[in-house]
Amino acid sequence: MPPKPLFPNVFPGDGAPRKRRLALALLAVPGLVPAVSYAQLSGAAAQPQPLDSPWDLRLAPQLEDHPLKDGAKPAAFVIADHTSGTAEQDLAAKGSAELRRGDAVVKADAIHYDQDTDMADAYGQVKVINGGTSFAGPEAHLKIEANQGFMTAPKYHFNVTGGSGSAERVDMVDNERSVFVNGTYTACQCSTNPAWYIKGSRFDFDTGADEGTARNGVLFFQGVPIFASPWMTFPLSGERRSGLLPPTFSMNSSNGFELSLPYYFNIAPNRDLTLTPRIISRRGVMTEATFRYLSPSYSGTFTANYLPDDRLAHRNRYAIYWQHQQNFGGGFGGYVYYNKVSDNTYPEDLGSANQFINGTQTLYQQEAGLTYNNGPWSVLARYQHWQTLPPSIAPYSREPQLNVKYTKYNVGGFDFGAEADYSRFRITTADATEGDRIVFNPYISYGVYGPGYFVVPKVQYHFASYDLNYLSSTTPNSPKRFTESIPTVTFDTGLIFDRSVRLFGQDFIQTLEPRLYYVYTPYRDQSNAPLFDTAESDFGLAEIYQPNTFVGNDRIADANRITAGLTSRFIDPRTGDERARFVIAQQYYFADQRVTLNPGQAAVLARHSDLIVGAALKLGSGFMSETAFQYNQNNNQLVKSSVGFGYSPGERRVINVGYRYTRANTTLDNQPINQFLVSAQWPLTRRLYAIGRFNYDLAGDRVVDGLVGLQYDADCWALGVGVQRAANGINSSGQQNSSTRFMMQLTLKGLSTVDNGLVSAFRAGVPGYTPLPPPPPPMSRFSNYE
């Protein structure tokens, strides 16, 4: 018969030594303690497995809690070299004493336990373990089941979160809450000399709420105090909690030294607020606030920045950014994008003060809209306005716009649809044409697809009606009301051949894909139509199979041309990955294109377009390449070229080299683009990584932007530094301004992890950049099971 719990069987005078192996056997009695195992399984494998004999123990495949029945009390067990006590009352245990009751474990040189009050007094090398938290000290007094009591000079460790520290005294309130007096806290795993720690006069820990609070706290890093506060809160794990975020230090040539001290408010699981005082040495103190909200039917972000009495600009400066998405249900939705700055130089002076960016934003969108999407229907109603900063040219605003689209696929083999749009165009530029425009664009196509071919004829129609209420002085004789009707016919066809080939000792499937694309659009005079939303489209592989050489609805190019292209791919038959692709394409004109963007421009008189050639390679060992060329055969000139190579043999190892060239043209103010670019992320040691980006303008003999950074990844902290020099607007003489910025970001793992701009800059500047690894996941409370 299995032995019973120890306490009811201890009689007065029973002080004989007990063999430890016998006491340990008590703990193995089935049903008295939870079965344990370190394997974590699921499904049928996670169920206890019976053995052949009904009297054998069952296997427990994972650690489990077995709650007691209502009204039941947990059994208590004692292990010691010597025990003595009174039945049903108290017990004294000496010599490697150990008391267990429920989830609680007390170990000490000597333990006195009063069963009536559930009070345990432990002396000498005391260790208390309860609910995944362990305390070690010279003396402890506590109620076992309630986990209420105190310990002197404790050292503690939260098994689940990894936090630890020491104090003069700890008062245990319950299984989740504890109060430490004159103590320390760190999430570093090393027991001595942690890289960072918080020292305070009092700590309140709540493992259930995953939150710690320090009174009169001082944050130390490498033994040096870096921050102090009379009250601070912090998370005990990686979950979101209110508290201080890592400070950000930066320096640039216009603002001087800057220090940002963000504080995070975890208002609710779906709402938070980050409040950041930003000390700018040359301008003053700026306040930034970012509020985020999320619900099943809406979400958004609101950010406001305010700098009172800028010491350099001698005025108040501010910026507002608001993005909101709304789902009303039934396919209805809405949104708001509102961005505004106080003055024309705000982006240059303050917009990128603590973040690295390339260039300066000069267009700020102010838009609100309602949407509807249901099956083939798509509807947009919006009001759109722009705040435009020099030197940008103000675009037209839509005040308002109503856009309706209908699309249907494969109805008896036909695809058809239409787009209807009404817009009222307004602009802040003086002496510019304004008015209303209605557009209706229906289409129908019939596609025939086979295993190795496709044929898609398509007919589309463009109807536009203009009602202009103001004409620019440059076009005083243009009509205010007129319409346009322009049909377009396209015929798209291609073949697909494939074969098996073997190259460089590897098998591939090679395809050969010739394609012909014919477009016919008759000429219609469109010189009376203003350019509300229209520009010349780029010319490349993405645009060469499009019917219109313009983007927007104010110009439809006349066309009688055919595009001939040939694509060849090399595909890995085992994985389906495309390892190489080669493309060549060119347009051939049967008639001159007479429609131009602006009246008076010369018509396109060439017999064929520039030749487009492209290639993409994805080889083994992390090597890849993309190349594209645009070549003018008539002038024997290279119009555009783009060459890029990438090498990434492993994680956080990437090198990119690129070159791009664009011949001077009127769009570029007759200035060519001739730039060389290299970027990389590479480990210098096991913990130290270098990041760099260098963009050099060969034509202008200047650095467009450069970025150099280092990241160091330690066990419980990470440090990143970066220096960037970039173009930053245009000065009064029309020359490019350049600014230099320095930024440093310290991350204390286990305290808070946030990117204040440096990692985002590395990611944007280096394609393929991989951030430093996150902290390891929290341990199970059974990881240090005793």
Curated annotation (Swiss-Prot):
Transmembrane segments: none annotated. The keyword Zinc does not apply. One of its GO terms (cellular component) is cell outer membrane. Residues 1-39 form the signal peptide. Keywords: Cell outer membrane, Membrane, Signal. Together with LptE, is involved in the assembly of lipopolysaccharide (LPS) at the surface of the outer membrane. This is LPS-assembly protein LptD. It comes from Burkholderia cenocepacia (strain HI2424).
